[in-house]
């Protein structure tokens, strides 16, 4: 019987179309199994189970806890005590008052609070901790959850003054930490630990900072004017509105207007897979929960229309569903941002495994609460999300971040299930040479950057090695962004009068070669054309262009590579002498936040004397 079935199956497979046999799951066609399950059910049935596991593990193993071979309390995670307090606090707050297990949970929580009170806990950790204490107080659980001696220590420790001077200056921190300080001051007031005077000053500081660094377009520069705009720049206004709400204040109409701009971007990058931002740092699950934060607070504040709320909620449910299926690994009892060919930012390394679990679950729980309060508790998500996005989101949109000496903007191109994000900014100090900050058409499964990888393999940017050994890429000094439409083809062009000289922590202008770049985006195809014009005669040692692709089974003919598997079907280059392709074989240099690239295509030209403009073009065709 078995052999008959096997033979029958073999015959069926032999005559089946290839697509039926090998129905590839790529990032663009991935759909989470719980895609149409209400967000509240996903959270209740999964997130709390994960928190219960961590609670029991902490009670048993205490500060000696081991997670997938790492020791979280020996990792130097400066936020961990606050994240532990918040994560386990969710369990207490979700346990009914008449539940017989509540008393033991409160006792265990008290012991863990006693254990962590002597540990380092900074800024965000303070914010997480005091926010939980306020909720426990409001629920009437505080006295049973935290001992008087520990609460007195926390009253002294959980203080914005630990990172703000008496002159109201931040102590060696980016200016967006004024928002953290403001929240802590307001939460201390709600605890009865201080009056509202400091909160008022810090609120003014926070809003002044936001206005200074967001200019007239409303998105916050992550640097002191260098022009780094990324997921944080878009998320920050939502965080500010959340801080108002959690401390009993109503956001102003001006803040709601800025939030609407962020919501527009969030809707424009929404998709059926629950995938998040594709550019900048701190992606993976954080790129996804960021969108849910923006959309949930926008829904709660009625910044979205009733119809937009329905589909923003449908997308948010898919993000939660994706977290449980894609990011969470039941065998590890943890999310996994570090295995399976995935690579994340150094500061989110595996040593922070426990804190990362707690902070992401906290974000899912908090945004779920916001959706519940907005009227969506246990609501069945709309199933026709793709059709709605196709109909209501512009196929092409441009959001300006800054204008002046340099232009900074985000172009979004929607092509069916693919969402292409071309972020034209300057990564600035510490990020300018990292590919997630390059002006590339990022799209999951098609083009991705590699976190903290530097420019050793400058993804899809021609790299000039000059005769003096210096290396240049066109990454930072973008001017004169222009867009045009020709039928269903969209064109974006810009110029750079200086290239980015590599090797320093900050970008350095190098005026030996000028660059004019044109992108053409159309259905199934993206083309970049670069015209490099030397200032005088320039001696070049080598030009190289690398593309790390998620597609594999590559065949190369001349300077065209075709792929048998993956979303990218063809990659072709002109203007360089030769190309070669090779499998990446799991090399860490070629890993995106959500998985490994499979093939590296390298094109290059040897020594040349550059007197005339040189055109280099690449085209990616995808399905």
Set out the residue ranges of the language-model regions.
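An alpha-helical repeat/solenoid feature that recognizes helix-turn-helix modules
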Residues: 73-95, 119-139, 174-192, 230-234, ...
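Extended polysaccharide-engagement surfaces of secreted carbohydrate-active enzymes
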Residues: 272, 291-593, 623
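Extracellular polysaccharide-recognition and catalytic grooves
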Residues: 152-392
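Helix-loop junctions that connect tandem helical modules in alpha-solenoid scaffolds
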Residues: 70-74, 112-119, 161-171
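Trp- and S/T/G-rich repeat-edge/linker motifs of beta-rich repeat architectures
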Residues: 56-61, 104-112, 152-165
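Low-complexity, Ser/Thr/Pro/Gly-enriched N-terminal "stalk/linker" regions
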Residues: 24-104
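Gram-negative bacterial Sec-dependent N-terminal signal peptides
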Residues: 1-22
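Short Pro-Gly-centered flexible turn/kink motifs
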Residues: 606-622
């Amino acid at each position: 019987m078995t052999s008959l079935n096997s033979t029958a199956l073999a015959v069926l497979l032999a005559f089946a179309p290839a697509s039926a046999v090998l129905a590839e799951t790529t990032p663009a066609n991935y759909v989470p199994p719980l895609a149409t399950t209400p967000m509240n059910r996903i959270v209740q049935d999964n997130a709390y189970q994960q928190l219960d596991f961590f609670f029991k593990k902490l009670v048993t193993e205490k500060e000696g806890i081991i997670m997938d071979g790492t020791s979280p309390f020996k990792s130097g995670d400066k936020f961990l005590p606050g994240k532990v307090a918040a994560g386990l606090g969710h369990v207490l707050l979700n346990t009914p008052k008449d539940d017989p297990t509540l008393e033991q949970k409160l006792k265990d929580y008290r012991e863990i609070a006693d254990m962590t009170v002597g540990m380092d806990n900074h800024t965000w950790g303070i914010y997480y901790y005091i926010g939980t204490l306020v909720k426990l107080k409001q629920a009437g659980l505080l006295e049973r959850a935290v001992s008087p001696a520990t609460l007195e220590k926390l009253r002294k420790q959980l203080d914005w003054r630990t990172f703000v001077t008496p002159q109201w200056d931040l102590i060696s921190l980016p200016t967006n930490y004024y928002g953290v300080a403001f929240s802590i001051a307001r939460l201390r007031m709600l605890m009865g630990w201080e009056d509202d005077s400091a909160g008022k000053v810090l609120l003014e500081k926070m809003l002044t900072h936001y206005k200074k660094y967001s200019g007239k377009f409303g998105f916050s520069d992550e640097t002191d004017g260098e022009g780094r705009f990324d997921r944080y720049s878009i998320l920050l206004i939502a965080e500010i509105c959340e801080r108002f709400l959690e401390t009993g204040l109503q956001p102003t109409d001006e803040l709601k207007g800025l939030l609407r701009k962020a919501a527009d971007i969030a809707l424009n990058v929404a998709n059926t897979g629950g995938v998040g931002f594709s550019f900048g740092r701190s992606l993976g699950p954080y790129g996804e929960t960021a969108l849910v934060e923006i959309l949930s607070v926008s829904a709660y504040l009625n910044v979205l229309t009733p119809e937009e709320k329905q589909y923003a909620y449908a997308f948010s449910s898919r993000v939660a569903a994706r977290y449980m299926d894609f990011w969470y690994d039941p065998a590890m009892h943890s999310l996994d941002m570090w295995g399976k060919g995935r690579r994340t930012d150094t500061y989110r390394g595996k040593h922070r495994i426990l804190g990362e679990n707690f902070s992401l679950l906290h974000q899912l729980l908090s945004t779920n609460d916001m959706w519940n309060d907005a009227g969506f508790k246990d609501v069945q998500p709309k199933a026709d999300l793709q059709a709605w996005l196709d109909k209501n989101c512009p196929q092409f949109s441009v959001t300006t971040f800054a204008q002046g000496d340099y232009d900074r903007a985000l172009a979004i191109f929607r092509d069916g299930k693919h969402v292409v994000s071309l972020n034209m900014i300057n990564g600035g100090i510490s990020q300018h040479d990292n590919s997630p900050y390059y002006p590339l058409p990022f799209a999951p499964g098609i083009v991705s950057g590699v976190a903290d990888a530097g420019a050793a393999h400058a993804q899809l940017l021609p790299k000039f090695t000059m005769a003096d050994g210096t290396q240049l890429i066109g990454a930072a000094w973008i001017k004169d962004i222009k867009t045009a439409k020709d039928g269903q083809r969209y064109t974006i062009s810009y110029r750079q009068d200086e290239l980015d000289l590599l090797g320093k922590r900050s970008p350095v202008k190098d005026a030996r070669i000028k660059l004019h770049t044109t992108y053409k985006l159309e259905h199934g195809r993206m083309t970049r054309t670069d015209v490099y014009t030397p200032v005088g005669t320039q001696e070049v040692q080598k030009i190289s262009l690398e593309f790390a692709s998620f597609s594999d089974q590559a065949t190369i003919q001349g300077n065209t590579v075709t792929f048998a598997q993956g979303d990218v079907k063809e990659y072709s280059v002109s203007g360089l002498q030769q190309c070669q392709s090779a499998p990446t074989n799991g090399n860490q240099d070629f890993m995106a936040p959500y998985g490994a690239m499979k093939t590296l295509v390298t094109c290059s030209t040897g020594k040349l004397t550059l007197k005339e403009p040189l055109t280099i073009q690449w085209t990616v065709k995808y399905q």
